[in-house]
Amino acid sequence: MEIAIIGASGYTGGELMRLLLHHPSADVVAATSRKLDGTPVASVHPHLRGLTDLVFRNAGAGDIDADFAFLAVPHTAAMKVAGTLAERGIRTVDLSADYRLPKDVYEKIYGVTHEAYFEAPYGLPELHRDEIRGASFVANPGCFPTGATLAAAPLAKFAHTIIYDSKTGVSGAGTSPSATTHYPNVGDNFSAYKWTSHRHLAEMKQEAARLGSTARCYFTPHLLPVNRGILTTAHILLREPMGQDEVEALYKKFYADEFFVRYQKPTLAAVRGTNFCDVAVESEGDRVVAVSAIDNLVKGASGQAIQNMNLMCGFAEDTGLRTAGMFP
């Protein structure tokens, strides 16, 4: 199957190429970039040297000749090409935020008018597998909502309040340098940001509601001085107390058939470079602390996008993604 990666020069584009090298049915035939036309992909992603001869092309959606496309472009950019890909019959996973939320919610949260809205399945396979399977266009979830939702999902309908506290690596900010991600400001440091106003909260609320929850949801992210990973602590305040054995049994049953969700003490090192989400819980009566760990670039972005592609195209869900973590 021939694949195009639109916006391939960033971290998620590089991860898509790295992971697709292990996919027996995937052949990446196009990697686009507006600014790097003619530049070898391996010059930007040096870990791929010797593994790909691709060069970046400044190609529009109308010029792409492929069976499948990944949109690895910023929000507002995806909406400008999604319609063209759909019209041409190119199945697509969109890694931007453009199709994750209802139109009115998106426009309120992101402060822009959606120029080409249509409904798309929300690509969290553990919760929406049936909608994703066979779809022609899927909206890949945000990194924070992935870790947060998987941490709280089994208990969401029993909660009256869920407080998400997430710590993320710097790669989540993308490749463009800024004062926030400048090494002297990040190294040997730790800080919260967007304390009450992070856009990903809207996705967390949406998924909690889809799980039958009426819980109030709150979210504060923090920036860690590491490259990869998100560790999320979900404080789940229950309407009725539940004991440790009951909560553990609930989580293990909920994720029993989910290859990519493992019940074990979450650490960033154990999931680095993988599509796994590690989850564990501890009960304090009417408060349960659920912790999850993901790699923000893999299960939080490119790996989950490939997981969605597999479902859309009829491949085994774990094809190309059975990768062990790089530990220690």
Curated annotation (Swiss-Prot):
Q: Which CDD domains match?
A: AGPR_1_C (cd23934), AGPR_1_N (cd17895)
Which of UniProt's keywords are assigned here?
A: Amino-acid biosynthesis, Arginine biosynthesis, Cytoplasm, NADP, Oxidoreductase
> Where does the record place it?
Cytoplasm
* Location, primary (coarse class): cytoplasm
InterPro entries (UniProt xref):
AGPR_AS, AGPR_type-1, NAD(P)-bd_dom_sf, NAGSA_dehydrogenase, Semialdehyde_DH_NAD-bd
EC number of this enzyme: 1.2.1.38
Q: What class of enzyme is it?
A: oxidoreductase
Catalytic reaction(s) noted: N-acetyl-L-glutamate 5-semialdehyde + phosphate + NADP(+) = N-acetyl-L-glutamyl 5-phosphate + NADPH + H(+)
Per the record, its GO cellular-component terms are: cytoplasm
Kindly list the GO molecular function terms attached to this UniProt entry: N-acetyl-gamma-glutamyl-phosphate reductase activity; NAD binding; NADP+ binding
Whether Ribosomal protein counts among this entry's keywords is no
* Pathways involved: Amino-acid biosynthesis; L-arginine biosynthesis; N(2)-acetyl-L-ornithine from L-glutamate: step 3/4
Coiled-coil residue windows: none
Cross-referenced Pfam families: Semialdhyde_dh (PF01118), Semialdhyde_dhC_1 (PF22698)
A Gene Ontology annotation in the biological process aspect, one of them, is: L-arginine biosynthetic process
Q: Does the keyword RNA-binding apply?
A: no
Q: Which Gene3D superfamilies does the record associate with it? A: Dihydrodipicolinate Reductase, domain 2, NAD(P)-binding Rossmann-like Domain
Give the positions the UniProt entry annotates as the active site.
C143
Spell out the family assignment given in the record's similarity comment: Belongs to the NAGSA dehydrogenase family. Type 1 subfamily.
What PANTHER family would the database entry show? N-ACETYL-GAMMA-GLUTAMYL-PHOSPHATE REDUCTASE, CHLOROPLASTIC-RELATED, N-ACETYL-GAMMA-GLUTAMYL-PHOSPHATE REDUCTASE, CHLOROPLASTIC-RELATED-RELATED
Tell me which HAMAP family the record gives. ArgC_type1 (MF_00150)
- Main role? Catalyzes the NADPH-dependent reduction of N-acetyl-5-glutamyl phosphate to yield N-acetyl-L-glutamate 5-semialdehyde.
Q: What is this protein called?
A: N-acetyl-gamma-glutamyl-phosphate reductase
- Organism for this UniProt entry: Methanoculleus marisnigri (strain ATCC 35101 / DSM 1498 / JR1)
From the UniProt record, report the name of the gene that encodes this protein.
argC
